[in-house]
């Protein structure tokens, strides 16, 4: 879902997948197969929050969503991520140039829930010891002038100014955000989930927070409970 700036501030893309049909994500909202793998699945058994759906990511699946995006010098990506099982890593690539190799950032959740992030082209250091079966809010803030990014997990900064992965390597340059690409292209077992993807200009200070409808609903419930005690 592409958003206009006036209604939603800095966010220019947001997707909860709640309105998607269960089954293949490919073919819905311009999601595509990537790297000749299989499609991830939309399902409603596991999701972030009490209602809705999420994307099930398993072994030998890779999917891609491209964007027109923006030319802002600072942009962000926000999403909720969870790995439940498997020796295979959940891999998330984000960039603008050549898909995969041209990623500005590559984030993995590996065996046992360990989270890694690329430090330029030099490697993928561990940035947090996560846990299996737990939802995490990932937020990446990209500085396209400095060619670096910061990475936050549940609001805690775990990466400070790591260089872009594709810069000067196989992928060329990353002038903006143009796609998100995720999955695991090998047979090692993986069970993971993605939900509530958001992209936009700036640092995305309110990204990952409940939207206005959620706030309104909670406010109505709150006042209803107060009235009940009167």
Language-model-derived ranges and their functions:
Residues 14-18, 188-205:
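Extracellular, beta-strand-rich glycan-interacting domains
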Residues 115-139:
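Short, aromatic/His-centered strand-loop micro-motif at the edge of beta-sheets
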Residues 21-54:
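Extracellular glycan-recognition surfaces and repeat-rich motifs
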């Amino acid at each position: 879902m592409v958003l206009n700036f006036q209604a939603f501030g800095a966010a220019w893309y947001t997707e909860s997948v709640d309105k998607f049909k269960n089954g293949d994500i490919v073919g819905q909202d311009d999601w595509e197969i990537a790297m000749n793998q299989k499609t991830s699945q939309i399902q409603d058994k596991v999701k972030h929050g009490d209602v809705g759906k999420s994307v099930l990511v398993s072994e030998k699946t890779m999917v891609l969503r491209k964007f027109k995006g923006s030319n802002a010098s600072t942009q962000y990506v926000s999403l909720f991520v969870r790995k439940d099982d498997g020796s295979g890593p959940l891999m998330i690539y984000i960039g603008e140039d050549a898909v995969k190799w041209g990623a500005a950032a590559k984030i993995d959740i590996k065996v046992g829930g360990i989270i890694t992030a690329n430090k330029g082209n030099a490697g993928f250091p561990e940035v947090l010891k996560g846990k299996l079966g737990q939802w995490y809010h990932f937020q990446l803030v990209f500085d396209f002038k400095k060619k670096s990014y910061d990475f936050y997990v549940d609001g805690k900064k775990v990466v400070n100014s790591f260089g872009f992965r594709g810069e000067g390597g196989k992928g060329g340059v990353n002038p903006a955000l143009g796609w998100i690409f995720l999955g695991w292209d090998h047979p090692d077992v993986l069970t993971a989930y993605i939900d509530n993807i958001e992209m936009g200009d700036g640092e995305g200070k309110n990204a990952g927070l409940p939207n206005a409808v959620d706030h309104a609903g909670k406010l109505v419930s709150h006042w209803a409970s107060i009235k009940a005690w009167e």
